[in-house]
Amino acid sequence: MSREVVVKVKVPSHYVGDIEREVKLAYAVDLFLRGIVSVERAAELAGMSLYDFLVELRRRRIQAYPYSDEELREELGIE
């Protein structure tokens, strides 16, 4: 059974921006890095497509899969 928890945090207004999205993303990345959820589940928790989540991981220099770019191209048969 899944349930949601609401967490209230006081943040100075000049830092707010799109804080809900940022917090969800940070939490999803953290869960992924700790091996608690898969990359697919983390993307879902962040409210992002898998592609967009992978782009975000790459931007943060986080490896989503244990392959180098060359190994991944070989595995997928891409030249």
From Swiss-Prot:
Pfam families cross-referenced by the UniProt entry: UPF0175
InterPro entries: UPF0175, UPF0175_domain
Family classification: Belongs to the UPF0175 family.
Protein name: UPF0175 protein APE_0890a.1
Originating organism: Aeropyrum pernix (strain ATCC 700893 / DSM 11879 / JCM 9820 / NBRC 100138 / K1)
